[in-house]
Amino acid sequence: MADFEIPNFGELLAEHLGAVPPEAYPFLLSQLERTAADRYRGWAQDVPEHAEGLLACAQSEDEIADRVESMFPPSAEHRALVARIIPEAKETYYSAFDSFTPIQQMTIQAGAERQGAGAWQNLKTLYPDRADEFDALSKIELGSADYLNTLLPTLLD
């Protein structure tokens, strides 16, 4: 159990998430998944003895983004809007990790993965015909969280 609070990423990113129309929301989330993939790649460098598993998590984040972009192909307008929003959203996301060690950051990310799984479940109300696909996305998120939760007790701060 972490001796610090895991941020609520929905609240942390609310300003950015609310800056897009509902139909662009999945694309914005997909770009945040790519941001998480970048974090995993960084941790793979920080903890090279576990690079294989961390890079698999990065690949999972990219897979989620690819699936979402396939499910909800963004219009040119939505791509442009998200391109304007994502730098600040990424900065906000990264700021939640700034004062922590890589191991603590991975602890936070495990919580973020579980929150991400919940976010995909919440979208089922807007897109009930995509429920199975959202379940699959949530399963991928939970797989990364489970990996981190298994890895973290083996690491020392």
Q: Model-derived features: where do they sit?
A:
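Non-heme di-metal
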Residues: M1-D157
